[in-house]
Amino acid sequence: MDDTITIALCCIAKDENPYFEEWLNHYKNIGFDKFIIYDNNSSPSIIRYFTDNNISTKNITIINWTDEEFGSQSRAYLDCCQKYSDFNYIAFFDLDEFYMSKSMNVKEDLKSLDYPDGLGIYWRIYGKS
């Protein structure tokens, strides 16, 4: 693999609009290239919230996802993998989950692990919020 890593971040959210700005800034700062957000009937919609609050949608794709069936998250993530398979990596983090490492650079972390095919990351819970 060449040294150019492309990495996308995918999530599905419903009514979590106030948390997007912090979440996006965190992941942009540590090296993610693209954000794919599945809007599961948020009110207001995520795109409306971004527009009303002047949040940039550069490198962000928002997909209306109104799947009411059980397993909606799994189907959204499968859809993401199929549509965005041109990325070297796709990560899945909810809006209350933040990737942290000593380097705080996800691409450097992947390089240091010799470009793994897959990576599982353990939770660390810091107590009540």
Question: Where are each of the predicted segments found?
Answer:
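Short beta-strand/loop segment that forms part of the nucleotide-sugar
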Residues: 33-41, 63-66
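Active-site-proximal specificity loops/subdomain of glycosyltransferases
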Residues: 45-92, 100-101
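Short acidic donor-binding/metal-coordinating loop in glycosyltransferase active sites
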Residues: 40, 94-98
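Conserved donor-nucleotide/metal-binding helix-loop-beta segment in metal-dependent transferases, i.e.
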Residues: 101-127
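Short acidic/polar active-site loop segments enriched in Thr and Asp
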Residues: 33-34, 88, 117
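Short, acidic, metal-binding catalytic loop of nucleotide-sugar glycosyltransferases
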Residues: 25-34
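Active-site beta-to-alpha loop of glycosyltransferases that engages the nucleotide-sugar donor
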Residues: 11-25, 41
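Cell-envelope/extracellular polymer assembly enzymes that use nucleotide-activated donors
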Residues: 6-8
